[in-house]
C-alpha cells in the first residue's frame, strides 16, 4: 500500500517531524511515500486508495492550523468510504493542556462522519493534559500525539513505534 502524507505547517514543526522522522520510518514499512501540503492540494489526491496520513498541528485555543482551517469546508464535503486514515498531531500539553492536539479530533470527526476508517490510535499514557477533542476513548487518542515543545526528545521513539503499529494494522486490513 502506498502512503500519502497530507499536512499543514505554519511554523515548520509539522514539516520538521515529517522530514526528520516520519519519512524515514515509513519507508521501512511502505513502498511509496509522498507528501502533499494541504495548501496546494489537488482534489484528485483523495481519489486514490492510499493510506492517508494526516498531519495537523493545533493552534491557540484548540484551533486548526491556518491551511487546514481554510480547507475544512471542502474537506467536509469529501466521501471517505473505503478510505483508510492515520492522523498525527502536534500540540503543547503544558501550555495548552485543555486543547492538547484538538486538531486530531476535529479532523477525525469529519473522516468518520464521511465514512473513513482511522487506524493508529495512540495511548494517552505518559502525557499530561486536562482535555482533548482527540480522544477516541479515555485511554487513546485517534492518532499520534507529538509535543515538540515539552517532549521533543520522545518524538523519534513515538514516531518509530507508531509507524510500526501502522504497518501491522495495514497488514491486518489487506
Task: Provide a role label for each language-model segment.
Residues 2-4, 34, 86, 119:
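A structural signal for isolated positions on well-ordered beta-strands in alpha/beta enzyme cores
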Residues 18-31, 109-113:
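Short helix-loop-beta junction
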Residues 30-42:
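A short beta-strand-loop structural module common to alpha/beta enzyme folds
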Residues 40-50:
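TIR-domain catalytic/interaction hotspot
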Residues 48-52, 56-174:
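FMN-binding flavodoxin-like domain, especially the glycine-rich phosphate-binding loop
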Amino acid at each position: 500500500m502506498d502512503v500519502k502524507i497530507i499536512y499543514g505547517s505554519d511554523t515548520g514543526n509539522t514539516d520538521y517531524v515529517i522530514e526528520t522522522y516520519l519519512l524515514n520510518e515509513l519507508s521501512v514499512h511502505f513502498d511509496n511515500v509522498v507528501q502533499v501540503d494541504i495548501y496546494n492540494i489537488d482534489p484528485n489526491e483523495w481519489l486514490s486508495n492510499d493510506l492517508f496520513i494526516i498531519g495537523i498541528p493545533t493552534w491557540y485555543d484548540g484551533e486548526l492550523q491556518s491551511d487546514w482551517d481554510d480547507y475544512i469546508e471542502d474537506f467536509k464535503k469529501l466521501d471517505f468510504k473505503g478510505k483508510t486514515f492515520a492522523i498525527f498531531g502536534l500540540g503543547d500539553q503544558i501550555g495548552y493542556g485543555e486543547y492538547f492536539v484538538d486538531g486530531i479530533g476535529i479532523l477525525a470527526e469529519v473522516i468518520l462522519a464521511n465514512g473513513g476508517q482511522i487506524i493508529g490510535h495512540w495511548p494517552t499514557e505518559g502525557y499530561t493534559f486536562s482535555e482533548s477533542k482527540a480522544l477516541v476513548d479515555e485511554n487513546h487518542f485517534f492518532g499520534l500525539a507529538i509535543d515538540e515543545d515539552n517532549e521533543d526528545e520522545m518524538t523519534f521513539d513515538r514516531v518509530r513505534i507508531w509507524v510500526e503499529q501502522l504497518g501491522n494494522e495495514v497488514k491486518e486490513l489487506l
